[in-house]
Amino acid sequence: MSPSDVPINWKRNLTVTWLGCFLTGAAFSLVMPFLPLYVEQLGVTGHSALNMWSGLVFSITFLFSAIASPFWGGLADRKGRKIMLLRSALGMAIVMLLMGMAQNIWQFLILRALLGLLGGFILNANALIATQVPRHKSGWALGTLSTGGVSGALLGPLAGGLLADHYGLRPVFFITASVLFICFLLTFFFIRENFLPVSKKEMLHVREVVASLKNPRLVLSLFVTTLIIQVATGSIAPILTLYVRELAGNVSNIAFISGMIASVPGVAALLSAPRLGKLGDRIGPEKILIVALIISVLLLIPMSFVQTPWQLALLRFLLGAADGALLPAVQTLLVYNSTNQIAGRIFSYNQSFRDIGNVTGPLMGAAISASYGFRAVFCVTAGVVLFNAIYSWNSLRRRRLAIE
């Protein structure tokens, strides 16, 4: 029996990759609450300079991740996904360790760029599970896996803030590096993959990858959907605290209220993603995708008219429940429309679009709020998501007509 014929316990791999995604999500978000403070500690002074450098060190990670993802995706298709998980976890652990030793802002900026170049654990975890899980359980498995990163991202800022208050800023980077090294060890000892390496000559070129897709236009529309999902999420991030302050008036605990309202969509997504993923396996992920996009539009519009923070919190909770279905549905449709041979690259291209959305979303939100006010951001974002819903519906309708 060849290595590729040995059965894989995909449920164990799903459990271990979930833990890995949880630890990675937590590790990334551990340092997020105090990034501007660390930038200031590295010698940046002045309001405008601090804003500029904080924005740079935040966005450069996503920018370099967008550039590097296709390369790592191609390497994953050649060498296997487990080795990419190991490479990512260990590489990020080393970079985080070095961040805690940075002496000036330029060193820190370069290390943030390296973090983007060496990242990709969650991307490769999705590709690994997508190629191992039975197709009829893809929605449930990918939905469940997505809750790992979401859970970590929810707990990370809270833990990071507490650790920074007790131990200072630099030690948090060392703790984060330790968390990522634990992720490396879990992957090394417990994840199993039967993968026969492919030589560079045997690898499909980009044109051949596109030609091998069942529906290239649909796959492109799914990439665009991923980008717009992240644009919609990111556009609200820069103005959320300020909008909450406008709604709440003079209250002493504005930071707590803002933090709670920022986190409720993640909690809702955590609850909804596996259930909606399983429903998608029954009725089709395309139906889940379109309905979730339409619900998102219907929830974004009233956010521009709310009068209290609690009204905003309720709408954001419902929005999070709908959003919890979006990326797993996109990933499931990508699985349906590609082969295992090119899964790494398809997921990496999707990650690049996601990273571009992470960069452009906050820029769009900040620009709109500066010109037209906070409330306009929600209306414009709703319009962008509505366009995406129509575009996605049209792409899926064409696929259905082509099949018929």
From Swiss-Prot:
Belongs to the major facilitator superfamily. DHA1 family. MdtG (TC 2.A.1.2.20) subfamily. This is Multidrug resistance protein MdtG. Its main location: membrane. GO terms for cellular component: plasma membrane. It comes from the Bacteria. Keywords: Cell inner membrane, Cell membrane, Membrane, Transmembrane, Transmembrane helix, Transport. PROSITE patterns: MFS. It is a multi-pass membrane protein. InterPro entries: MFS, MFS_dom, MFS_MdtG_subfamily, MFS_sugar_transport-like, MFS_trans_sf, Mutidrug-R_MdtG, Tet-R_TetA/multi-R_MdtG-like. The keyword Transport applies. The chain crosses the membrane at residues 19-39, 56-76, 90-110, 113-133, 144-164, 171-191, 222-242, 254-274, 288-308, 317-337, 376-396. It is found in: Cell inner membrane. It comes from Salmonella choleraesuis (strain SC-B67).
